[in-house]
Amino acid sequence: MHIHDWPTHERPREKLLARGATALSDAELLAILVGSGLRGQDAVQTARDLLHRHGPLRLLLDRPAKALTRLPGLGPASACKFAAAMELAQRHLMSALERGEALSDPPSVGRYFSQRLRARAYEVFAVLFLDNRHRAIAFEELFTGTIDGADIHPREVVRRALLHNAAAVIVGHNHPSGNPEPSEADRAVTKRLLDSLELVDIRLLDHFVIGDGRPVSFAERGWLE
């Protein structure tokens, strides 16, 4: 059955317009980007198959556009829609940060770190530098590889913060395994970083660990007090 033959209230586009995007499942949202399904399938079933065979969602959406075109059911047009949607989401979050709006909403900052780091196949440690009104100055990826206490150099974070004349920083790194739970090494290096930044009167506002699902916030857990 084609989606056009579905009851109106069950069609993804009509459902989105009537109830908002949050009312749709992952497959229904993807179906809107897919447009039309494979022969003999509707777009929702094609989207479900994509998630089943090439998911989870983060791995599917974070693929480069050229890689998406090689998946069944996704031609160049759909692949470009996927890539454009992800880039728009990232730019929206950065725009909010630049206007100083998102820092009153810590989950938005966590989502921004997720957008930047989640798809990496290796660990990346990044820093968001902020002015004295907590507006974004710059976002930099400072360390890559296997992140542990020996790989993060607090002096380099301090040096870059002073170069940007930053009053505060938010840091984040990803766990390619998908498990966002901080390790003991993560906690140890965060303590070293906190102590180093305090020496030059720069605040460490949060440390996000990125994996599948919601980022883990050190500030939310009370680990920066």
From Swiss-Prot:
A GO term, aspect molecular function: metal ion binding
Glycosyltransferase is among the record's keywords: no
N-terminal signal peptide: none
Residue span of motif JAMM motif: 173-186
Keyword Zinc listed: yes
Alphabetic keyword roster: Hydrolase, Metal-binding, Metalloprotease, Protease, Zinc
MPN domain boundaries: 102-224
GO biological process: proteolysis
Binding locations of Zn(2+): H173, H175, D186
Recorded superkingdom: Bacteria
Membrane-traversing stretches: none
Similarity annotation: Belongs to the UPF0758 family.
PANTHER family: DNA REPAIR PROTEIN RADC (PTHR30471), UPF0758 PROTEIN YEES-RELATED (PTHR30471:SF3)
Official protein name in the record: UPF0758 protein XAC3915
Lineage: Bacteria, Pseudomonadati, Pseudomonadota, Gammaproteobacteria, Lysobacterales
